[in-house]
Regions:
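Extreme N-terminal starter segment of soluble prokaryotic enzymes
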Residues: 1-4
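A short, glycine/small-residue-rich beta-strand->loop->alpha-helix junction that serves as a flexible
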Residues: 8-19
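Conserved N-terminal ligand/cofactor-binding loop architecture of enzyme catalytic domains
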Residues: 20-99
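Glycine-rich phosphate-binding loop signature in dinucleotide/nucleotide-binding domains
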Residues: 97-103, 199
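A conserved, positively charged/aromatic
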Residues: 98, 125, 141-151
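Structural motif
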Residues: 104-105, 150
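Active-site proximal beta-strand in glycosyltransferases
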Residues: 105-114, 118-136
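A nucleotide-sugar donor-handling region in carbohydrate enzymes
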Residues: 149-200
């Protein structure tokens, strides 16, 4: 089996989740690759989006944009958002990458590749299993307009929120956010931990 994990460089949480998934799969002898989705289009695009994201998280701008996204997502007819439209533009490039590398399944840890994968599924270009792993503790704006096989969410207490937003209940799997267990099982003396935290 060969799995593709699609991420984006918009905050390290998505990439950390992707790395944890890769480690877990490789321990089970599953071949797994991580790909920055936007870098398939161009490294420059990936850098620009990453820089725009980092800039948007300064001050209250991110919160404002997030709230606007939530409002718009709740009001639009699904599959008509500009987010879906933009990510649909590189769907063919993504399809060729998946086909050429013979992946058996795709896991998305970011909304952008989930939107592109949705476009591929709607056009019946892709018939392999697709998964979304939520890295936030809420249903993010525009997620309900995606159409993947399963949505892995952080906790069962969030099921109703995702259902109310439009994610089909039968597709929700509440098993948590993947983390690298080695980082949380290695004991570090308190003095060393304090020193590491103050150096950050």
């Amino acid at each position: 089996m060969k799995i593709l994990i699609l991420s984006c460089n918009t905050g390290e949480g998505h990439n950390s989740c992707a790395k944890a998934l890769k480690i877990a799969m490789e321990r089970r002898d599953i071949t797994c690759d991580i790909q920055d989705t936007l870098a398939l289009v161009s490294d420059e695009l990936s850098r620009r989006v990453a820089n725009a994201y980092v800039s948007s998280t300064q001050g209250s701008l991110f919160e404002t944009v997030y709230k606007i996204g939530g409002f718009v997502s709740d009001k639009i007819d699904f599959h008509q958002s500009i987010i879906y439209g933009v990510n649909r533009l590189y769907a063919n490039t993504l399809y060729e990458y998946i086909r050429d590398n013979a992946y058996d399944a795709v896991v998305c840890v970011h909304l952008f590749p989930a939107e592109a994968m949705t476009a591929l599924r709607r056009n019946e270009m892709l018939r392999i299993p697709t998964y979304f792993v939520m890295t936030d503790y809420t249903c993010i704006p525009f997620l309900p307009e995606t159409d993947l096989d399963y949505y892995i969410i952080p906790h069962e207490h969030l099921i109703e929120e995702f259902v109310e937003k439009g994610v089909p209940r039968e597709k929700i799997v509440p098993i948590g956010i993947p983390v690298d267990e080695q980082k949380f099982t290695t004991r570090v003396p308190k003095s060393q931990a304090r020193q590491q935290l103050t150096e950050s």
